[in-house]
Structure formats: structure tokens, C-alpha cells
Curated annotation (Swiss-Prot):
The keyword Ribosomal protein applies. One of its GO terms (cellular component) is cytosolic large ribosomal subunit. This is Large ribosomal subunit protein eL30. Expressed in roots and leaves.
């Protein structure tokens, strides 16, 4: 039971940090805008839902590797990611341009 509690707690931690980014930072939502930020190397972190289509996922990961931007795989589907962002719609991928008051970039790179 302890590992599941730890996984749930880290998931809640990511959700809290993501909400802080939504309030105080800059971000883009959606596949096309994420690709634009990757091409221009503006993003600091890319977050993908676990049910993101494989072709989109591989394309985003390839662009992120070329731009040297880290990718975090969210442990929920696109509905959960949209809810964590405080939106009422599904979010497949998002790019964090400026984390604001949140330290989400340092915590997600150390957990992977």
C-alpha cells in the first residue's frame, strides 16, 4: 500500500504545481502551439497526457529532443490533465514557457 500512496501523493504534488503555473506563469495548451514553441525553443517543459496518440507523442518527443527540452508524461488521461490545469476541456499536451512561482521544472526532471 505504501508505493501507491507515494505515487498518489506525487501526482497531487504535480497537480498543485501545475495549478500554480496556471496562475502565475506562462503556458500554451494544444498540439499545434506546443509544436510552435518547440520549433522556436521557447518552452522549458512539455507535459503529455498518457492517452496522447502515439504519432503525436513521438513527434513532440523528437522535437523536444532536438530543442533539448524535457518531456514529462502525466499519469492521467487528457481529461485529468485538463482538470489539473483548471480547464473544463481536455488537454492532450501543454508547454510551460515560464513557470512563474512554481518549481515544477526542477521536480519533474528529478523524478524521471
Amino acid at each position: 500500500m505504501a508505493p501507491t500512496k507515494k505515487a498518489k501523493k506525487s501526482g497531487e504534488n504535480i497537480n498543485n504545481k501545475l495549478q500554480l503555473v496556471m496562475k502565475s506563469g506562462k503556458y500554451t495548451l494544444g498540439y499545434k502551439t506546443v509544436l510552435k514553441t518547440l520549433r522556436s525553443s521557447l518552452g522549458k517543459l512539455i507535459i503529455l497526457a498518457n492517452n496522447c496518440p502515439p504519432l503525436r507523442k513521438s513527434e513532440i518527443e523528437t522535437y523536444a529532443m532536438l530543442a533539448k527540452i524535457s518531456v514529462h508524461h502525466f499519469h492521467g488521461n487528457n481529461v485529468d490533465l485538463g482538470t489539473a490545469c483548471g480547464k473544463y476541456y481536455r488537454v492532450c499536451c501543454l508547454s510551460i514557457l515560464d513557470p512563474g512561482d512554481s518549481d515544477i521544472i526542477s521536480t519533474t526532471t528529478t523524478t524521471q
